[in-house]
Amino acid sequence: MDYIVSVKGVSKSYGEVQALKDVCFEVKPGEIFGLIGPDGAGKTTLFRILTTLVLADEGKAEVCGQDVVKNYKEIRRQAGYMPGRFSLYQDLSVEENLTFFATLFNTTIRENYALVKDIYQQIEPFKHRRAGKLSGGMKQKLALSCALIHRPSILFLDEPTTGVDPVSRKEFWDMLLKLKQEGLTIIAATPYLNEMKCCDRIAFIREGKIQGIDTPDRILQQFSSILSPEGLSFNEPQVTGRYAIEVEGLTKQFGNFTAVD
């Protein structure tokens, strides 16, 4: 298999809003492929199409050699998906969540423990704690363990470290690099450019369009007027009405751009 993911001419609209516009790219087996772009760029929509949760309006996409529409059941068996928001069962314990996801794929924690051991051992002392009571970093490790418990061929991570402290972010990417060494293909979306340094290649997406695909350093050079190498990343404003609160002259904007007048 030359490419484990192939996307050709994919477009998707929600009403009058076009989330994706003629998106094309390919991912090689065993690489970490980064998808970087501001909020609203289309990253989550693209991930939902590739994980068979949303249908594209136009174009074709394949994952693990399978068409995302015709062979969605096979893709769901071969792919692991970690959404941007913590989506596990808050009222179940750590162990119960992992057991539940293993059962969905007709396997057990014991059968695949070796795969998640390095990650799960860090939260195993809290296996009886409810998931809703975990810290951000521990939730992240639990979600990754659940995404891996069925031994997927490819892992989709939608902004997995957003809202997590810097130490936990580094630990998380260290775990991903180790998974890559074991042959797992990883596609990760993030607004953090310093995380993209860990990727083999990245695609820069903005307003639903792929602007460029290359190594992290070359993308930074190509789009230096837009991207900032220091931290959270985008020099262009991306604030919409739902991210701003204005009360009697007091204005607070969330995300990359915070201002109080």
Where are these regions (language model features)?
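Conserved ABC transporter NBD signature motif
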Residues: 59-67, 75
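ABC ATPase "signature
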Residues: 213-214
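Hydrophobic anchor residue at the start of the ABC signature
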Residues: 144
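Conserved ABC nucleotide-binding domain
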Residues: 110-132
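Catalytic Walker B motif of ABC-type/P-loop ATPase nucleotide-binding domains
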Residues: 155-158
